[in-house]
Amino acid sequence: MAMISLQAMRKAQRAQGPATILAVGTANPPNLYEQDTYPDYYFRVTNSEHKQELKNKFRLMCEKTMVKRRYLYLTPEILKERPKLCSYMEPSFDDRQDIVVEEVPKLAAEAAENAIKEWGGDKSAITHLVFCSISGIDMPGADYRLAQLLGLPLAVNRLMLYSQACHMGAAMLRIAKDIAENNRSARVLVVACEITVLSFRGPDERDFQALAGQAGFGDGAGAMIVGADPVLGVERPLYHIMSATQTTVPESEKAVGGHLREVGLTFHFFNQLPAIIADNVGNSLAEAFEPIGIKDWNNIFWVAHPGNWAIMDAIETKLGLEQSKLATARHVFSEFGNMQSATVYFVMDELRKRSAAENRATTGDGLRWGVLFGFGPGISIETVVLQSVPL
């Protein structure tokens, strides 16, 4: 018997077409907090109502975020049971860890089930699981717990990514693209889940960066099914992933970051963050779309991680974008806050639903080509070129 050539073996292993997003699912905790009443709630549950001047400043911060409402896991009842979470810097990691190890996989499972339901395939066909979260570090990891909750095959190939933050929603699509295109018939379940339990803490007059986090972050999970060569009549493509790249802005590691300590997770942000991101997005776009010949960024649809209102304003101004381009990202941010790695999946879900509701020609607001952007600590910029499908 003639031995198969290495080239033939590799060809047989690879998919024929590009990686394709086949379904999107999202989930949030049940507890909805309106932004206009959140300052009263926050200062009450942290026993800080005597800090009236600081509360007034926090109220102004909440208004400036442009967030209308957020979903959060923590409730007054949970905080009463674990009062250390309400202090500013009391050692409390064990209390926080006890919560996230259990709750991160649970919320992730809700989003994953929604994506799997839309996809319509059998869980036994899921070959890979890629999961990211800032919190929930444990052994076995949150990926193991999620696979157990979903009843995924024992042979599913799992990859867990911890402590990465906002850009990882896009980064996981880069990883899923490589998996799907290099493993024929692979179906990749991609899940991002963020719960702010690690970073919740009481207010302090000396730490306005911590207050900024309390004003803007929300809890949520997003999931996608990614695979190449969709089964006709069974699987319904939403977007093709045509390319995916990452770049790191030099000498920017101090612009945004977090540190895991006994007190939980602490964040820092530099005021120059919006400008740094806006100044570097253009180069990433130019490199990504050069093979396609697109140079006008108003001729593509946008699935962008919002970050915050100032970041979107800076990108819009720097690139000369029409207001409609980031409208979906702004809408998601105002309705859910910054859910870090999961946010961009909510943006994609909103875009494809809005495109259908408004009778657009494609899932990309009527346009063929688009970009999915993520940015996070590093500063790391993820650029994913998408091709929409007809509606």
UniProtKB/Swiss-Prot annotation:
Domain of life: Eukaryota
Biological processes per GO annotation: flavonoid biosynthetic process; polyketide biosynthetic process
Catalytic activity field: (E)-feruloylacetyl-CoA + (E)-feruloyl-CoA + H2O = curcumin + CO2 + 2 CoA
Pfam families: Chal_sti_synt_C (PF02797), Chal_sti_synt_N (PF00195)
GO molecular function terms noted in the UniProt entry: acyltransferase activity, transferring groups other than amino-acyl groups; curcumin synthase activity
EC number: 2.3.1.217
First-tier enzyme category under EC: transferase
Pathway: Secondary metabolite biosynthesis; flavonoid biosynthesis
Family per record: Belongs to the thiolase-like superfamily. Chalcone/stilbene synthases family.
Protein name: Curcumin synthase 2
Species name: Curcuma longa
Name of the encoding gene: CURS2
